[in-house]
């Protein structure tokens, strides 16, 4: 496992604010250099994973993780941004991503006794659900097991920017989501 620096759980670094534009520039350069305009779905998926690997090669994983998922201030609210996640999510680091989310949850539980998760899923698609299927299923099995500490201390999961086809995406994973968890999911129209 890579050292990702859990000492500071909240996002406050000015460098993190610049990270998004640097990632965007790298993705643009990658797209131009690798001629990623192919239309085959499997090719596009491979190219997205290759681009994610390129982002991982150029940026510190800890910075990427802290930009993707963080605790806002001194609160018990964990924010997860899919728009950042998708820029670097690669099967080689799925365990590290899960470790980061678990560490944030445990920090909130130890500090506040409870926690909430806020997830921005803007631009999440059915193909993204398929691409990250292994990670999503692992998240459900590790983090959202019935009667686990993480479930017992979870107040709500707020979902922001749900795509129109979100119900279709939810059906894909509905067998893995416990009824107790489903009752804690709240869809919010505005973004965080």
Model-inferred region functions:
Residues 1-156, 160, 164-192:
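SEC14/CRAL-TRIO lipid-binding/transfer domains and related phosphoinositide-recognition modules
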């Amino acid at each position: 496992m890579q050292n990702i620096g859990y000492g500071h759980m909240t996002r406050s670094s000015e460098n993190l604010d610049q990270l998004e534009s640097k990632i965007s520039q790298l993705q643009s350069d990658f797209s131009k250099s690798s001629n990623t305009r192919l239309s085959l779905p499997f090719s596009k998926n491979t190219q997205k994973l290759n681009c994610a690997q390129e982002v991982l090669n150029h940026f510190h994983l800890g910075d990427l993780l802290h930009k993707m998922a963080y605790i806002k201030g001194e609160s018990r609210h964990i924010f997860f941004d899919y728009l950042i996640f998708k820029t670097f999510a690669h099967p080689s680091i799925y365990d590290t991503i899960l470790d980061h989310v678990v560490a944030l949850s445990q920090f909130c539980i130890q500090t506040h006794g409870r926690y909430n998760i806020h997830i921005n899923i803007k631009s999440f698609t059915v193909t993204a659900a398929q691409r990250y299927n292994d990670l999503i299923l692992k998240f459900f099995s590790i983090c959202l097991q019935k009667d686990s500490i993480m479930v017992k201390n979870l107040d709500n999961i707020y979902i922001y920017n749900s795509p129109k086809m979100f119900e279709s995406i939810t059906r894909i994973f509905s067998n893995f989501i416990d009824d107790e968890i489903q009752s804690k999911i709240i869809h919010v129209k505005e973004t965080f």
